[in-house]
């Protein structure tokens, strides 16, 4: 029996203030709904270990603050991340309209830029009646950017696990691809090195 590979991945969750990022994270990691609203200042980190195929993943998930005045500070936490959950509140049109800014902030901090970077969009609070962002509009935004979309409820635990694990799977694929490319590049011999020489 082969031992499982172990991989550590850093994921981030970003979006406007009040969209439920902390509640989504607590629902995923602890299976509890985080009702008491407190603004996240900077970032907080939770970890979860999951198994995908033959790999044990340790997910370190950074919950970033959504306040405008902290955006430049928060964006420093994006560096070195392997994937991102973009979140908005389906009852708050402004949180949806701000997604391009959040996505742009994340992509501006990711190195190397030429690599694909896994993202998933979550439309949270589908349990509430006063919806302002139609599902079709969010799906259209995602189609343009080739990002998977999930309608979720942190309160009722709808699609939360599926969304996080879709991102984890894509982040793992990217990690493995980068690792393979790096190994391939380091193994290649230059023409001069490949010729055998004699004294």
Curated annotation (Swiss-Prot):
GO MF entries: GTP binding; GTPase activity
Record text about domains: Switch 1, switch 2 and the interswitch regions are characteristic of Rab GTPases and mediate the interactions with Rab downstream effectors. The switch regions undergo conformational changes upon nucleotide binding which drive interaction with specific sets of effector proteins, with most effectors only binding to GTP-bound Rab.
GO cellular component: Golgi apparatus; late endosome; late endosome membrane; lysosome; phagocytic vesicle; phagocytic vesicle membrane; trans-Golgi network
Alphabetized UniProt keyword annotations: Cytoplasmic vesicle, Endosome, Golgi apparatus, GTP-binding, Lipoprotein, Lysosome, Membrane, Nucleotide-binding, Phosphoprotein, Prenylation, Protein transport, Transport
Amino acids binding GTP: 15-22, 34-40, 63-67, 124-127, 154-155
Pfam families from the UniProt entry: Ras
Motif range (Switch 1): 28-41
Protein purpose: Controls vesicular trafficking from endosomes to the trans-Golgi network (TGN). Acts as a negative regulator of TLR9 signaling and can suppress TLR9-triggered TNFA, IL6, and IFNB production in macrophages by promoting TLR9 lysosomal degradation. Also negatively regulates TLR4 signaling in macrophages by promoting lysosomal degradation of TLR4. Promotes megakaryocytic differentiation by increasing NF-kappa-B-dependent IL6 production and subsequently enhancing the association of STAT3 with GATA1. Not involved in the regulation of the EGF- and EGFR degradation pathway.
Listed InterPro entries: P-loop_NTPase, Small_GTP-bd, Small_GTPase
Membrane topology (UniProt): Lipid-anchor
Name of this protein: Ras-related protein Rab-7b
Residue positions of motif Switch 2: 67-82
Residue numbers with lipid attached (S-geranylgeranyl cysteine): 198-199
């Amino acid at each position: 029996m082969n031992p499982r590979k172990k991989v550590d991945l850093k994921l981030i969750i970003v979006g406007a203030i009040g969209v439920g990022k902390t509640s989504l994270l607590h629902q995923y990691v602890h299976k509890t709904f985080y009702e008491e609203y407190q603004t996240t200042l900077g970032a907080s980190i939770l970890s979860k270990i999951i198994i995908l195929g033959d790999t044990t993943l340790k997910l370190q998930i950074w919950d970033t603050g959504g306040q405008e005045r902290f955006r430049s500070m928060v964006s420093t936490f994006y560096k070195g991340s392997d994937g991102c959950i973009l979140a908005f509140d389906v009852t708050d049109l402004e949180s949806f309209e701000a997604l391009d800014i959040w996505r742009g902030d994340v992509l501006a901090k990711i190195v190397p830029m030429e690599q694909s970077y896994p993202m998933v969009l979550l439309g949270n609070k589908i349990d509430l009646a006063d919806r302002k962002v139609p599902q079709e509009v969010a799906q259209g935004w995602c189609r343009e950017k080739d990002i998977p979309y999930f309608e979720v409820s942190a309160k009722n635990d709808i699609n939360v696990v599926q969304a996080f694990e879709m991102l984890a799977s894509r982040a793992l694929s990217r990690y493995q691809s980068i690792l393979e490319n790096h190994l391939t590049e380091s193994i290649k011999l230059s023409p001069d090195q490949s010729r055998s020489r004699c004294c």
